């Protein structure tokens, strides 16, 4: 494809390489380093004048460093006369801080949106935003892609009894997501209501729905410390589920998450590769990874060629 350049930040170079390979492109040359005072320095090592530039950087690892690196890369390309700069952010940072949940609390997701725009981003491509209204924080186009088509494909190919499964949301906020998946599989859905007094701490959970003698599939957009999904798995087994799977778009797995998964009753915990999982898989045999590079690559191709990306909301590209 002419007049297109793809650059990778340092947060997820493996995913960036897969995207570039699917597009038949080489990753652009970029040098990232830290000064002795820990300031980030980025040098774009090739011309981007008049080019359609895509910068792949996921909000993971050292998130603040990754975000700052992305902002500097966007700005470097913009002031080097790139015709358009698109930030490809598979896992959007600060997405959970999307509203004021108490007095004097910040709306950090809006701040990140402002920073990306001011840095010079013309377009954002992301996946399964924690809150879809974050798209409205931007004054530039935002394509929020969905992992759902790849999730449906994985379920059909890897769970033999999927026709006798039940899709479960671990909280009320995910009801729309699970009903969509359940409708397409033509199966039932259930809901777990949780009462949370403090962040990352769940006080009690109530199951709404019948999971007896069924394979239960927990579906959520992300898992961080995994307290919620592990408690939910125990609740589902005690309610009569034969097996329990968890399918998550963003596997953050911070703190004691991996040890919790290892001791929990999951058949498998399935995540996409919006966040690197290689190190975590070494310590947890239950983790399975769905590759979503083909969705991001096709979104880039369609954006570059001026085509609609809505096809990707319901189909897995070849």
Curated annotation (Swiss-Prot):
PROSITE patterns listed in its UniProt record: PRPP_SYNTHASE
Residues binding Mg(2+), per UniProt: 128, 130, 139, 143
Disulfide bridge positions per record: none
Ligand binding (ATP): 96-101, 130
GO MF, one annotated term: protein homodimerization activity
UniProt cross-references to SMART domains, sorted A to Z: Pribosyltran_N
Reaction(s) the record says it catalyses: D-ribose 5-phosphate + ATP = 5-phospho-alpha-D-ribose 1-diphosphate + AMP + H(+)
EC category name: transferase
Spans annotated as Binding of phosphoribosylpyrophosphate: 212-227
EC number(s) stated in the UniProt entry for this protein: 2.7.6.1
Pathway this chain belongs to: Metabolic intermediate biosynthesis; 5-phospho-alpha-D-ribose 1-diphosphate biosynthesis; 5-phospho-alpha-D-ribose 1-diphosphate from D-ribose 5-phosphate (route I): step 1/1
GO aspect biological process, one term: ribonucleoside monophosphate biosynthetic process
Protein activity control: Activated by magnesium and inorganic phosphate.
Co-factor requirement: Mg(2+)
Keywords carried by this UniProt record: ATP-binding, Kinase, Magnesium, Metal-binding, Nucleotide biosynthesis, Nucleotide-binding, Transferase
A cellular-component GO term for this protein: ribose phosphate diphosphokinase complex
Segments traversing the membrane: none
Expression (tissue specificity): Testis.
Family: Belongs to the ribose-phosphate pyrophosphokinase family.
Quaternary organization: Homodimer. The active form is probably a hexamer composed of 3 homodimers.
Its job: Catalyzes the synthesis of phosphoribosylpyrophosphate (PRPP) that is essential for nucleotide synthesis.
Name this polypeptide is given: Ribose-phosphate pyrophosphokinase 3
Organism from which the protein derives: Homo sapiens
